[in-house]
Regions:
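Extended, non-globular alpha-helical segments
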Residues: 163-166, 235-264
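Conserved beta-strand-loop-alpha-helix hinge in the C-terminal portion
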Residues: 209-239
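ABC family nucleotide-binding domain
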Residues: 2-184, 188-192, 200
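A general structural signal marking secondary-structure boundaries and capping sites
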Residues: 59, 125, 152, 208, ...
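Short hydrophobic beta-strand elements within the C-terminal catalytic ATPase subdomain
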Residues: 65, 206-207
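Conserved catalytic segment of ABC-fold P-loop ATPases
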Residues: 199-206
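Residues within helix-turn-helix
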Residues: 195
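ABC-family P-loop ATPase nucleotide-binding domain
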Residues: 1-13, 253-265
Length: 265
């Protein structure tokens, strides 16, 4: 793992053709800390993850990881999408082991380590099953096990727990916090779940608008586990809710626009 895993965006713009996705985005996530990005749909949250992962490049500005500019995919970065990306013909255990064998670990050792990570996410008994035999929430946990098995310096996560029930989501949140504490990885997570954001974040990045811009960066000093009924956290929750409600109101169609769309449809 890198000596420093600080992630930094400096005046990043990203356009797709003539459409600007994010505009002048700057923020920093310190080494070994947990950053969470929230904002309305369409504000470029997933775009930021792709830029941090090296899957795409900024139109202007810079992204740094560990003091080095991100240019292309790095071995010490793991990205967990909403859609799992599991190999459908492989068992859960083989899916987790695959990346380890690509790093020249023996198949036997990779298989054993994969089973350990599946046990960590509560799916050891599902190791011999293929993805079609798993629920959506189970697939998400297999994908999480696969990402963590690589022991990344930075873990980038896009709505990783969206398909999980409430109880399993809380278990996975605690597991993720424990893993961060144990490995020292830096984590950047995108979520629409405000309770999840306040439960996990050391630093909260609030995006607004389309194209997405940084409205505010909020540091949360509360220790874990957190009681969201605490006055400070409850106040933050109200602030975040008001922010998203204002964003939703500003993006609503006018009556004239809605009528025109209906007429064209």
């Amino acid at each position: 793992m890198s000596a420093t895993t600080e992630l930094q965006f400096q005046h990043v713009h990203k356009a797709f053709g003539t459409t600007l996705a994010v505009r002048d985005v700057s923020f920093r996530i310190a080494s070994r800390s947990f950053g969470v990005v929230i904002g309305p749909s369409g504000c470029g949250k997933s775009t930021l993850l792709s830029l941090a992962a090296g899957l795409d490049e900024p139109s202007s500005g810079y992204v740094f990881l560990g003091g080095r500019e991100v240019r292309g995919i790095r071995d010490d970065v793991a990205l967990l999408f909403q859609n799992y990306n599991l190999f459908p013909w492989m068992t859960a255990q083989a899916n987790v082991a695959f990346g380890l064998t690509m790093r020249r670990m023996s198949r036997r050792a990779a298989s054993a380590q994969a089973l350990n990570y599946l046990n960590d996410v509560g799916l050891g008994a599902c190791a011999p099953r293929i993805p079609d035999e798993l629920s959506g929430g189970m697939k998400q946990r297999v994908a999480l096990a696969r990402a963590l098995a690589l022991k990344p310096s930075i873990l980038l996560m896009d709505e990783p727990f969206a398909a999980l029930d409430y109880q399993t989501r809380k278990i996975m949140q605690r597991y993720l916090l424990a893993t961060r504490a144990r490995t020292g990885a830096t984590i950047l997570l995108v979520t629409h779940d405000l309770a999840e954001a306040l439960t996990l974040a050391d630093r909260l990045i609030m995006l607004s608008g389309t194209p997405g811009t940084v409205q505010e960066v909020i540091d949360i000093k509360a220790p874990h586990p957190r009681d969201l009924s605490h006055p400070v956290l409850a106040g933050l929750m109200r602030k975040l809710e008001a922010h998203l409600e204002a964003e939703a109101a500003s993006s609503e169609f006018t009556t004239e626009e809605r009528n025109r769309i209906m007429a064209d449809g």
